[in-house]
Curated annotation (Swiss-Prot):
HAMAP family: QueF_type2. NADPH binds at S88, K89, R255, G256. It is found in: Cytoplasm. The active site is at C187 (thioimide intermediate), D194 (proton donor). Substrate binds at I86, E87, S88, H226, E227. InterPro entries: GTP-CH-I_C/QueF, NADPH_dep_7-cyano-7-deazaG_red, QueF, QueF_N, QueF_type2. The gene is queF. Homodimer. The keyword Transmembrane helix does not apply. Keywords: Cytoplasm, NADP, Oxidoreductase, Queuosine biosynthesis. Transmembrane segments: none annotated. This is NADPH-dependent 7-cyano-7-deazaguanine reductase.
């Protein structure tokens, strides 16, 4: 059995599990980033210098010291240089374990979340808990850029094929932000669909939009975690388009009270966590 198979075999994802309602940090499970990065040839050195897995957790509740339930929404940033990514079902089960446990205040819960996620990810993690009153003021955002989805083309390829990007640039030097709402991949373990919007910001020779859209649609039956898909897109664009500067940012729809929004760039900092219409 390969190391890749052994690491994934222990995950709770796709298995019947018991929901525990008293705090238990051991419910968190890690997936080594090395698994996917070995395949991409970037385990030793990544082609991006900025990045995070930006999570929003909508289903967080605990009891105060008088036994009254409290609720909040969390913004979580897991640094791309962390050794592990966090497996999503284990994160959901872990958050559920707060439900019947008492904590002094929101700040204590925030501190515990951050400490536990740092240990699991083995890297930098930022956590901010938001009251519902504060979060309700956050507007629905849009990713800036030109949408490439309305092209009048015929699509027949739904199997992942990076070679669809071959000869994808012309000689015109541009800075562009391109957006597609048609990103869809499948969970590596359960095969459940993952729906996302992706923004590609680059400086370099102009990328052919038809080729780019065909490439993105080819993820439609591809099985990989969200974070891995974004790193694959980044690496493929660097290989075939060879831009001077590149950012890839995907915002995926919510599942189990969590959305995951990976960002990778070689030139710009991590964006604010602003939800889109489908989130």
């Amino acid at each position: 059995m390969q190391y890749h198979d052994q690491s994934l075999q222990t995950l709770k994802l796709g298995k019947k599990t018991e929901y525990i309602s008293t705090y238990d940090r051991t419910l968190l499970q890690a997936v080594p980033r090395k698994l996917n990065r070995d395949d991409l040839g970037i385990s030793t050195k990544q082609p991006f210098s900025f990045g995070a897995d930006i999570w929003t957790a909508y289903e967080i509740s605990w009891l105060n010291l008088k036994g009254v339930p409290q609720v909040a929404i969390a913004d979580v940033e897991i640094d791309y240089q962390s050794e592990n990514l966090i497996e999503s079902k284990s994160f959901k089960l872990y958050l559920n374990s707060f439900n019947q446990s008492q904590f002094e205040n929101l700040q204590q819960v925030e501190q515990i979340l951050q400490q536990d996620l740092i240990k699991c990810a083995k890297g930098q993690v930022k956590v901010r808990l938001n009251s519902l009153q504060n979060y309700a003021q956050q507007p629905i955002a849009t990713l800036q850029g030109e949408c490439i989805d309305e092209q009048d083309i015929e699509i027949r390829c739904y199997e992942f094929d990076p070679n669809l990007l071959e000869n994808c640039t012309n000689k015109q030097w541009v800075e562009e932000k391109l957006v597609s709402h048609l990103l869809k991949s499948n969970c590596l373990i359960t095969n459940q669909p993952d729906w996302g919007t992706v923004q590609i910001h680059y400086i370099g020779n102009q990328i052919n939009r038809e080729k780019l859209l065909r490439y993105l649609i080819s993820f439609r039956q591809h099985n990989e975690f969200h974070e891995q898909c974004v790193e694959r897109i980044f690496c493929d664009l660097m290989k075939f388009a060879q831009p001077e500067k590149l950012s890839v940012y995907a915002r995926y729809t919510r599942r189990g009270g969590l959305d995951i929004n990976p960002f990778r760039s070689n030139f710009e900092p991590i964006p604010l966590n602003q939800r889109l219409a489908r989130q």
